[in-house]
C-alpha cells in the first residue's frame, strides 16, 4: 500500500479536535494531499456542525461512564475449561479472588486451559473492556499461565507468562471501534496445568463513545497481504481482513481466485468443545469467522490448502454469514492410500507414494506422518479399482501388523487380503479412529450458508454444526479433489448437525468417499445420575467424544426421557444450570420434576430440534450409512441418489445408552429417491436399505412408539436381495408407490424384505417389483407386531 496515513481522535472538547498523524512514509505530495482532503472534510464537517460535538457535560458523562461486567450464566456454560468448574466472584478453589496479595470482590475464577466467551452489551457507547488478570494466591503451587483477550479473529492483548505471586496485569481493550460484539477470555497453560488457577478481575465496560464503522463495504483480501500461489502462511493476512469486516459492521470479503496455504503457526488458538469429536485443549483455527454479522465471503473458486492439525474454517457467534465458491483441502490427507499390486495366501504387496503420504516403518509397523503429527494404523477400508465402490463384505478391516519395505515405494504386508476379495489395482485407505478437528465448524451461529463450498479432506467430520439455527448448504459438498488420485474424503461424517434448531437445508451437493454418513442430524441427551430434590438433577455427558458444549441454558425447556423405554416424560424449564466440569452438570428447573424421573433416565433440550430438507444430493461410495436423522421436526428426503453407500442408505435412530443421540422422529417423508446397491457391507444398525433403529433397552415395557409418521413413496430401488425396510417401535409407517428392481450383482442376504419389531399401522401397497411378484404377509418378519397391524392395499 502506498504510504500508511492513519488518524486517531485523541481528544474532543467542545469544538476543538486534534488528530494524531502516524506513520507518514515517503509518498508524493499529490497522494498525501488526496488522502488528507477527505479527512479535512470530516474535520470541517465537525466544525460546521454536520457531526455535532458533545457538550462538555455530555462528554464528561461519557468519559466517566462505567458499566460493571455482568457475566451471564450462559457464558459459564459455554466456557471450555480443562478441569473443574468456572466460578463467578470466586476462585477456582471456591475462595475469594486474590492476586499478588490483593483481594478482588468481583471476577471469574477459572483453571487453565480455558476460554470464556463474553458478550458485549448491546450499547453503542461501550467502547472498551478494562480489567486485570493473574494467578490466584489460593493455588497450592506455582502455576504458569498466559492470559489472552481475543476478538473473533485476532489476539487483542496478551499478558505474557504469569506466575503465582505476581501482581495482576491490567488491560484495556478497544471494543466498539473494532465492531466487537463478543470477546474471548483465554487462559492458556504454559509449563503444564498444575496449579493454573486463573482469575479475571475488576472487569468493566467503559463508555466513551460509539466508534461505529461504515456498513457493507467490500474488503479485498489482497489489500491485507493475501497472496495466492505461494507457500507462505496466509492466515494472519486473512484474519486481518476479517477484523476489518467486523470493524465496518459487515460486508463482502473478496478473495482473488488462487491457491492459498495455511499453517498452525498463523492460526488463532482457541479452546471450545466440539460435539462427536476428540477433545483437544486447543483448536488452531486458520479462518475464524467469529463475531460477525451480515458477511459474505467470496472465494471465487479459490482453493485453501491446510497443513497440520488445524480447524480450517470456523463460523461462531455470528449471524447471516455466507461462504461462496471455495474449496478446502489438506496438503497431506489424514488417511494414507496404498495401491494393491499383489496378493497371495500370506501377504499383500502395496505401493505408497511417500511424497503424498509420508511415513516411517518402526518396529515393522506403520507410523504415518504429517506436519506436527505422527499416528499409527488401526484399520483400513478397501475401494474397488475403477468404480471407487467399497469392496463388498469388507466393512472395517482391523489390522496393525508386520510391514516389510521392498525398495522404492513397494511394501509387503503380512496380511492375507485375498480372502476379502481384494485384488491388484484396488486401493486400501489406511486409517485410525482419531477425530481431533472437523474441517469446518459452525457454532452458536444463525443463518449460515455454504454455496458451492467443497470440503475435500478432514480428520473428523468435514462439516460440524452445533448449537446453531438455520443452515443452508447448496452445491459443493464433500468429494475427492480432482487430480489428487484419492478415493477417500472425510474421516467421519460428511456433515453433522448436533443440537440445532430452525431449518437445515442441504441440496444439490455431492458426498463421496467419507468414512461415515453424508448427513447426521440429532440432539444430545444427558444421562440423569441423581435426583437431588424435587427441582434438581445431576446429569452427565455420557460419551467421551460428546462432552462440554452447552446442551441447556437457563430459560430453555428440557424433555425427560425414560432410560429403559425411551418414552418421553414431559418437559420443564431450566432455572439454573451449573457445569461442574466438562462431563457433569447440575440442573434446577422451575416446575417440580415428574415423579417418574429417576437415575438412569435422560434429558434433552426440547427447544433445539431442527427441521431438515435433504434434497437432490448424490451420496456414493462411503462407509456406514448414507444419512441419519433423529429429530421430531419435519424431515424431507427427496430426489437423492444413494449409490453404493456400503451400509443403509437412510437410518432413523435414537438412543440413551451409547452416543446418547436423541430426538424421536414425528414426520419423515422419503420420496423420489434412487437407491443403487446399498448394504454391500454390514455396520451397526444397518438392517435394511431404510433402517429405523432406535436403541430401546426394554422394548416390551413401552406403552408408546418412539418414531411415527414415516412415509416412503415414489422411490426406485435397484438392489440385490437385501431387506428394504426394517423398523423398531414405529407407528404409522407407509411404503407405497415404490419401484423395486432386483439384480444379482452381489450375494443376497436371504432375508425377508420387510422386518418389523413392535410396530403399528403399517401400510404396504401399490409397489411395482421386477421380476414381478406380489408381496404378502409372508414377506414380513414380525416381532411383537400383530399381523393385523400390517396391511397390503386399501
Swiss-Prot record:
Give the top-rank taxon of the lineage listed in the UniProt record for this protein: Bacteria
Lineage summary? Bacteria, Pseudomonadati, Verrucomicrobiota, Verrucomicrobiia, Verrucomicrobiales
| Protein name, UniProt field | Alpha-1,3-galactosidase B
What organism is recorded for this protein? Akkermansia muciniphila (strain ATCC BAA-835 / DSM 22959 / JCM 33894 / BCRC 81048 / CCUG 64013 / CIP 107961 / Muc)
Q: Which reaction does it catalyse?
A: Hydrolysis of terminal, non-reducing branched (1->3)-alpha-D-galactosidic residues, producing free D-galactose; Hydrolysis of terminal, non-reducing linear (1->3)-alpha-D-galactosidic residues, producing free D-galactose; Hydrolysis of terminal, non-reducing alpha-D-galactose residues in alpha-D-galactosides, including galactose oligosaccharides, galactomannans and galactolipids
The protein's GO terms of the molecular function aspect are:
alpha-galactosidase activity
Where do the PbH1 repeat units fall?
Answer: 468-499, 609-631, 632-654, 665-686, 707-728
- A Pfam short name: Beta-barrel_GLAA-B_I
Task: Give the range the annotation lists for the signal sequence.
Answer: 1-57
State its role: Alpha-galactosidase. Removes both branched alpha-1,3-linked galactose residues of blood group B antigens and linear alpha-1,3-linked galactose structures.
Give me the gene this protein comes from. Answer: glaB
SUPFAM superfamilies, sorted: Galactose-binding domain-like (SSF49785), Pectin lyase-like (SSF51126)
| Family assignment from sequence similarity | Belongs to the glycosyl hydrolase 110 family. B subfamily.
Amino acid at each position: 500500500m502506498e504510504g500508511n496515513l492513519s488518524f486517531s481522535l485523541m481528544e474532543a472538547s467542545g469544538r476543538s479536535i486534534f488528530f494524531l498523524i502516524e506513520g507518514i512514509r515517503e509518498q508524493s505530495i499529490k497522494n498525501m494531499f488526496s488522502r488528507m482532503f477527505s479527512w479535512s472534510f470530516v474535520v470541517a464537517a465537525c466544525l460546521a456542525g454536520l457531526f455535532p460535538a458533545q457538550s462538555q457535560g455530555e462528554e464528561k458523562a461519557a468519559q466517566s461512564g462505567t458499566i460493571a461486567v455482568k457475566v451471564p450464566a450462559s457464558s459459564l456454560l459455554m466456557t471450555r475449561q480443562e478441569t473443574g468448574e468456572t466460578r463467578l466472584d470466586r476462585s477456582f478453589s471456591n475462595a475469594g479472588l486474590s492476586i499478588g496479595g490483593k483481594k478482588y470482590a468481583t471476577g471469574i475464577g477459572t483453571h487453565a486451559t480455558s476460554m470464556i466467551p463474553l458478550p458485549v452489551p448491546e450499547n453503542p457507547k461501550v467502547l472498551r473492556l478494562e480489567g486485570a488478570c493473574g494467578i490466584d494466591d489460593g493455588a497450592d503451587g506455582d502455576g504458569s499461565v498466559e492470559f489472552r483477550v481475543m476478538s473473533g479473529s485476532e489476539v487483542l492483548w496478551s499478558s505474557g507468562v504469569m506466575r503465582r505471586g505476581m501482581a495482576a496485569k491490567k488491560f484495556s481493550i478497544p471494543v466498539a471501534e473494532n465492531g466487537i460484539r463478543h470477546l474471548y477470555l483465554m487462559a492458556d497453560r504454559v509449563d503444564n496445568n498444575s496449579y493454573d488457577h486463573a482469575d479475571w478481575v475488576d472487569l468493566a465496560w467503559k463508555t466513551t463513545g460509539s466508534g461505529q464503522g461504515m456498513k457493507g463495504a467490500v474488503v479485498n483480501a489482497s489489500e491485507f497481504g493475501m497472496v495466492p500461489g505461494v507457500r507462505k502462511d496466509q492466515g494472519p493476512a486473512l484474519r486481518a481482513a476479517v477484523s476489518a469486516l467486523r470493524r465496518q459492521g459487515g460486508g463482502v470479503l473478496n478473495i482473488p481466485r488462487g491457491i492459498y496455504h495455511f499453517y498452525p503457526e498463523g492460526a488463532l488458538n482457541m479452546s471450545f468443545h466440539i460435539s462427536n469429536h476428540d477433545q483437544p485443549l486447543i483448536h488452531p483455527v486458520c479462518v475464524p469467522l467469529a463475531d460477525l454479522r451480515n458477511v459474505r465471503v467470496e472465494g471465487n473458486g479459490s482453493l485453501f490448502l491446510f497443513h497440520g492439525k488445524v480447524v480450517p474454517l470456523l463460523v461462531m457467534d455470528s449471524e447471516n454469514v455466507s461462504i461462496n465458491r471455495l474449496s478446502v483441502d489438506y496438503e497431506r490427507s489424514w488417511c494414507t492410500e496404498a495401491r494393491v499390486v499383489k496378493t497371495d495366501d500370506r501377504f499383500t504387496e502395496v505401493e505408497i507414494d511417500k511424497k503424498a503420504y509420508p511415513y516411517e516403518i518402526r518396529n515393522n509397523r506403520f507410523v504415518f506422518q504429517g506436519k506436527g503429527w505422527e499416528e499409527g494404523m488401526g484399520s483400513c477400508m478397501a475401494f474397488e479399482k475403477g468404480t471407487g465402490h467399497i469392496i463388498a463384505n469388507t466393512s472395517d478391516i482391523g489390522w496393525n501388523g508386520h510391514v516389510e519395505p521392498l525398495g522404492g515405494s513397494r511394501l509387503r504386508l503380512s496380511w492375507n487380503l485375498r480372502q476379502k476379495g481384494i485384488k491388484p489395482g484396488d486401493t486400501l485407505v489406511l486409517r485410525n479412529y482419531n477425530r481431533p478437528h472437523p474441517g469446518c465448524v459452525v457454532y452458536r451461529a444463525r443463518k449460515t450458508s455454504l454455496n458451492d463450498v467443497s470440503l475435500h479432506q478432514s480428520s473428523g467430520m468435514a462439516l460440524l454444526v452445533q448449537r446453531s439455527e438455520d443452515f443452508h448448504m447448496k452445491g459443493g459438498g464433500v468429494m475427492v479433489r480432482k487430480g489428487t488420485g484419492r478415493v477417500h474424503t472425510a474421516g467421519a461424517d460428511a456433515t453433522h448437525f448436533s443440537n440445532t434448531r430452525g431449518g437445515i437445508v442441504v441440496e444439490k451437493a455431492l458426498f463421496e468417499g467419507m468414512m461415515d454418513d453424508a448427513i447426521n442430524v440429532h440432539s444430545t441427551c444427558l444421562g440423569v445420575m441423581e435426583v437431588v430434590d424435587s427441582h434438581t438433577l445431576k446429569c452427565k455427558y455420557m460419551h467421551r467424544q460428546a462432552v462440554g458444549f452447552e446442551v441447556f441454558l437457563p430459560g430453555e425447556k428440557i424433555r425427560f426421557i425414560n432410560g429403559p423405554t425411551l418414552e418421553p416424560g414431559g418437559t420443564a424449564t431450566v432455572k439454573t444450570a451449573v457445569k461442574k466440569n466438562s462431563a457433569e452438570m447440575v440442573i434446577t428447573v422451575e416446575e417440580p420434576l415428574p415423579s417418574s424421573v429417576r437415575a438412569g433416565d435422560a434429558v434433552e433440550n426440547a427447544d433445539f430440534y431442527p427441521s431438515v430438507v435433504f434434497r437432490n444430493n448424490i451420496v456414493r461410495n462411503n462407509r456406514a450409512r448414507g444419512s441419519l436423522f433423529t429429530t421430531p421436526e419435519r424431515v424431507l428426503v427427496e430426489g437423492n441418489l444413494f449409490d453404493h453407500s456400503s451400509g443403509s442408505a437412510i437410518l432413523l435412530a435414537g438412543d440413551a445408552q451409547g452416543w446418547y443421540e436423541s430426538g424421536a422422529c414425528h414426520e419423515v417423508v422419503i420420496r423420489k429417491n434412487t437407491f443403487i446397491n446399498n448394504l454391500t457391507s454390514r455396520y451397526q444398525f444397518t438392517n435394511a436399505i431404510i433402517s429405523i433403529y432406535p436403541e430401546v433397552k426394554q422394548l416390551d415395557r413401552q406403552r408408546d412408539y418412539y418414531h411415527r409418521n414415516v412415509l416412503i413413496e415414489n422411490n426406485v430401488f435397484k438392489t440385490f436381495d437385501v431387506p428394504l425396510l426394517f423398523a423398531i417401535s414405529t407407528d404409522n409407517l407407509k411404503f407405497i408407490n415404490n419401484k423395486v428392481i432386483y439384480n444379482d450383482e452381489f450375494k443376497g442376504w436371504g432375508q425377508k424384505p420387510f422386518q418389523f419389531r413392535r410396530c403399528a399401522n403399517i401400510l404396504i401397497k401399490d409397489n411395482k417389483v421386477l421380476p414381478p411378484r406380489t408381496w404378502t404377509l409372508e414377506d414380513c418378519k414380525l416381532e411383537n407386531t400383530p399381523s393385523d397391524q400390517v396391511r397390503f392395499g386399501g
